[in-house]
Amino acid sequence: MKHPYEEFPTGSKSPYNMSRGAHPGAVLLSPQSSAINKNNPGSNSGNNQGNSSVTANVLSPQSHSMSLNDMLDQQSFMLDTAGTRAQPLQQQQQQQQQQQQASLPSLNIQTVSSTAAGSAIVSPMMQSPKALQSTLSSTSMYLDSFQRSPNNILGIPSQSGSIPLPQSRQSQQQSQSQKNDPNMGTNFSQDINQLCSWISMLNSSQQNTVMDNILSILNDDVLKYTKLKIETLTNTPFISPPLPAIASPIPNRDDTQILNIDSVFSSSPITNDPENTDNLLYQNWSPQPHSIPISQPIYDNITDASQRSKSAEPHVNSSPNLIPVQKQFNNGNSTKYKKLPSENPNYLSHSLSSSHSFFQPKKRSNMGNEYNSHHHHSLHHPLHNTTSYFSNTSRPSGTDLNKSNQNVFNNTITHPNAGPTSATSTSTSSNGNTPLSSNSSMNPKSLTDPKLLKNIPMWLKSLRLHKYSDALSGTPWIELIYLDDETLEKKGVLALGARRKLLKAFGIVIDYKERDLIDRSAY
């Protein structure tokens, strides 16, 4: 049986030797696809062999989807190589399958396999053995590291190709590939370590450039995580470098005994410098100590704005053993005590000097005189420490008590300022000092009132001692004023302050009685 193409003439008039534009539709006049599986039964001429190969490789339009230009290129290449014996169809199919299993399809090599037709159409570059070897070598070098999927036998591009996939599918495929491949996690950690080591070897400017490029391609959620991570690391206290320890130099002091506080300032060599004399806290009030000067003065940066001369200080503050704080207190307040009691707002009462003297038993005979002298002394010398006027001695007899009281009141009469209408106490000392105002309850006019003297409870109420009315109301006032401390205690006046107050009031009444200044109606 003759081949369908044998009826065409050969030579220059053959349609295979014509130019491409002369017969654009000649390639479409191919037989059915079933005729391709038939082999040529040994033709003697080379042209017949070439024609059989052409008919075996060219398919009808129904069996493939190649464009017209690709088909014309394939036909012209086959006609140009008609002088050489083409490979049989089965051998070409075997080579094509080996090529597909060895490498992935690229942009330059496009392979389409059709198992139903049992034939394949490849690019003209694949027909040349040299081109085939060069292409396989170049593609295998680049694609050796990738694993070929079984789905690529038909020439379908794999997932690792240049076709972009959606981000969700990529993440799913990456997670699936990591689960399927146990070495993926190890390789990923190695890549991270290599990247970190490479970045650590860069300088600051290079690292800034790398971070600019990395941040520009990160997703929004990764950028938020990075920002949160940076804020957390920045706010952590242990990231900040530790502060260097700053300590003041320790002065080199010798074991020489320091005599007083002034030697700390006076022994420094800086004190001898006239420029630094104003920087001292206190002036030198004591002699220079016999000690080696220290290397660094203490408190040399503190100045005292209230420096005073030594002559302005009172005699009380002239002790060299006082500490500087006491000196400063005395310097600032020494002038206040030179004023009179009426002009001094900070005047201290006599209780600051010898208040403890009132809480000791005293003699009844010296009560009036010591009371006046004590007040006069505390008036002019409020800060001077006085001794106790009242000592714990034996009490005199009744005759001695009367004599001593008579002496006290006789000395009071000789004073020209004494009078019954005076609001102050008329009892003064024999040296002629001025009287001191007493409490309102000790007013002689109220104490010598005849109505109060006849009514002992009311008289005690004027002294704010009405709680002792039951103990003293049965005694007349003439006998009551001569009671001593022990008798009052036996009668029930147990408070020491109450007994002293009664004894003072008794002395005033006795004074008025001896001078006949009490109204006769009181008797």
UniProtKB/Swiss-Prot annotation:
Its localization reads: Cytoplasm, Cytosol; Cytoplasm, P-body
| SMART domains per record | SAM (SM00454)
This chain belongs to the protein called: RNA-binding protein VTS1
Return the PANTHER family for the record. PROTEIN SMAUG, STERILE ALPHA MOTIF DOMAIN CONTAINING PROTEIN 4-RELATED
Q: What else is known?
A: Present with 3200 molecules/cell in log phase SD medium.
InterPro entries (UniProt xref): SAM, SAM/pointed_sf, SMAUG/VTS1_RNA-bind, VTS1_SAM
Comp. bias regions, Basic residues: 374-383
Family stated for the protein in its record: Belongs to the VTS1 family.
Q: What is known of its domains?
A: The SAM domain is essential for RNA-binding.
One GO location term (cellular component) = P-body
Organism the protein comes from: Saccharomyces cerevisiae (strain ATCC 204508 / S288c) (Baker's yeast)
Q: Where is this region: Disordered?
A: 1-57, 85-105, 150-187, 305-448
Q: Which Pfam families does the UniProt entry name for this protein?
A: SAM_2
User: Which SUPFAM superfamilies does this entry report, sorted A to Z?
Assistant: SAM/Pointed domain (SSF47769)
